[in-house]
């Protein structure tokens, strides 16, 4: 199952998201996907417990540039997430193309206790 969304902030396109789920999550097609996918999953008893995030850069394709209202080949943030449940079973993967002029990433760190 693939869900494509264009995230808007203050009327401006900010993020193109492509989220992929296995067929096990076909019930999502009956849901309102304009809100939080995590809230929908939690409502259905599916809880994210962790995952992996990779952040890089990419250049926009013509289609991506049109959606984000930027020039083709413009540098964007590229983020890939893999989210898992408490057993480490993948729930979904998500690729995001993010306009860095309209988005901020904040990473909180914790001291190593080992």
Say what each PLM segment does.
Residues 1-114:
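C-terminal all-alpha effector/ligand-binding and dimerization domain
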